[in-house]
Amino acid sequence: MPVINTHQNIAAFLDMLAVSEGTANHPLTKNRGYDVIVTGLDGKPEIFTDYSDHPFAHGRPAKVFNHRGEKSTASGRYQQLYLFWPHYRKQLALPDFSPLSQDRLAIQLIRERGALDDIR
């Protein structure tokens, strides 16, 4: 379950996202997927423990995830990309990359796609 207190259908949708992203039941997660970093081409799963900022916020190189050299910074329960993190951190006044901040960001993305009312 997400940590945010929200409508039960929104909570269920967030759970579905976490399952589909492979984070909810990730073999290393210690926090329901909120601590999962995208697995790179090397196949080594990884988690993070510092929620003060997005794991890729301070210059950590993105992970190569295929043989074409494509890279990802996907992190957290909903595999949120660093590319969008600074914008949403400011817009939503998110203090950190904690589970609550990740939930709030995910709900904002759903809202922006016009799907929030459909989920309720």
What spans do the regions from the language model cover?
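Cell-wall polysaccharide-cleaving catalytic domain and substrate-binding groove, primarily
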Residues: 1-95, 104-119
